[in-house]
Amino acid sequence: MIGTRVGGSGSTEIVQANQPQPSAAVAQAHPHAVSPSSNPPLTASQSAAQAPESSAAGAARLPVAPRHLPTLEKFRAEQPTVQGTSTPTISANAALLIGSLLQSEKLPFEVMAARLSPERYALQQFHGSDLQQMLGRFAEPGHLPGKAETEQLIKGFARSLADQLEHFQLMHDATAEAFGPGGLRDRNTLAVSQAALGEYAGRASKSIEAGLNHSLAVLDERIAALDSQLEGATEDSRPVLLMDRQALETARAMLSDLHVDFCKSPEAKRLSAVAAHTQMDALIDKLNVDRSSVGGWKGIGPIVAAAVPQFMVSMLHLGYIRTATSDAMKDAVPEKSADASMKRALAVGLTAGVAHEGVTNLLKPMVQAGFQKAGLNERLNMVPLKGIDTDSVIPDPFELKNDNGALVRKTPEEAAEDKAFVASERAVLNQKKVQVSSTHPLGEMIPYGAFGGGQAVRQMLNDFNLLNGQTLSARAVTSGIAGAISATTQTIAQLNSTYVDPRGRKIPVFTPDRANADLGKDLAKGLDLREPAVRTAFYSKAVSGVQSAALNGALPSVAVQPQGASGTLSAGNIMRNMALAATGSVSYLSTLYANQSVTAEAKALKEAGMGGATPMVARTETALSNIRHPDRASLPHTFQPDTLGGVPRAVENAYHMARGALQLPTQVVVDTVRVVEDGVASGVSSLRDAHKPAETSSPTADDAAAVELTAMEEGRRR
């Protein structure tokens, strides 16, 4: 329910497309039909109340609250269309009256709307519609409708339904805008109507897809039934059954294509967006309630849920595995060897990079599943946080608008302006979602500060002889603590992150993720090497690990006390050692984080129409774009171009260019490996096909049926 519902002035008329309800019953009613029949059975009095009745006759018996009788009189005096035209008017009274009716009697929204004015507010219903009847014909051999005709009817029904939903939402908006400073009781009444409209819109927006799914299920049942009949069919009945089965298979293929096409269509997207507008109040209330469940001291749960697994993975892959490998290579490769640096970088980088990806994707899902298994997610709120769905909070703008009480379609200029506004608001929200992550310039400072600061403190304590900070465990535990601090800081920032929509409503950007963990699926997401995306992630982390190790190895060694000397280092050497320890940690992480964000940046670049022309080198293309076009909108930005004369944005752009420079060497190698991998896989497949022996197996049942059907048809033609 953002401000983009209503644009400027326009003159295009909207003609309501209420389909007449056919009297013929449909053989199989859809189980999720958008109609009163999908609700609990109506009582006798309720059923009688649904009989067609004129507005004038029914208005006298409307059970509205006494305080709403003057509003009812105003509604009766309204004109349904703009004088002298067929353009519908938007009533500022109807929504309140529907809410009043719903407070007196619990009925579906569409029933109450029609009761208020059957001439004006007879809402679209899938059940009993021409569309449902046409879909029913797919299960009748010999009565298959045309694909183009069906597609046109589906999209026409969807457009008409979306127009009606927009009309009703604009009606509710008009009522809300008419309220004065008071009117709390009426606002509650309007909220009842708004909630009921959202519930109806949720059913209605899904009715077409559900109807298509239902028809596909019916076809599957019919085909299965024919298969059973064919098993015991006689020679006389078999040809007819085969023809019926072939007809149903053809119908199913066509219906499946229609289903896929509709789900991807602008009409389906518009229906989802309109439904999101009608459900916005309920969604925001739910998001705030969910956010309150981890508010205050309860926020310790999400903090622990983030800090504990991060402590474990950082201690293991950055601490023990990377440090142990580095120490082992120092002993194995002589310092004076000409290629010592390269050998160490390869060994340490490959090991640490693969460990970083593998350990993270192994331990984090296991720890979260463990929290759920122990019930800590319910008792102590130990749940992760997830970003809210941007499109649900900021849906696409309406195509219709309220033009001084008239329902008209926006002009192309108004529609383009509203879409641009929505895009800008989504960009703001998306920035907030990534602002504290390691893929954002500011977000990266959190782990840099935690890990760099942790290693600096460890080095300082070692140089002051307060502990032996050079042991494997000391360095590993420091990495673990730094990881926990980083995760804690990020979670606290997420718990306090809010987005203010154009209507001034505060919406939490992150919400608790209380979904039941599926450990098998969660592990497969990051560890199933059969998936190309998983392999690419490992390639990227391994190669970037080598690059990180090479950069880290180029740093000078820390100063140490001469052999046999006592006391501590000078203050200057201690400060130098602390700086080197911090720099070493940051130099190692910077390449990992830069390359970690390539996948998301490549996707955003493609969606913006600036990349993806050559899929095999998409990652290299992304790195180059970060160097050449750091100011593009698809990259995360904290500052606007005009903030403080553009200086902060220029610094941010330089940062993106540096990230691109770190990404480029790694991603060139990754893309090369992917090309080689695809070439090898293609070659092996071709070789296997070339040496595959000719098959002489008997035809399958489907093949036999097709042969018999063809022979039968040829016999008829003779």
Curated annotation (Swiss-Prot):
Residues 1-10 have a biased composition (Gly residues). Residues 44-60 have a biased composition (Low complexity). One of its GO terms (cellular component) is extracellular region. It is found in: Secreted; Host membrane. Residues 1-63, 683-718 are annotated as: Disordered. Interacts with the chaperone ShcM. This is Effector protein hopM1. It comes from Pseudomonas syringae pv. syringae (strain B728a). The gene is hopM1.
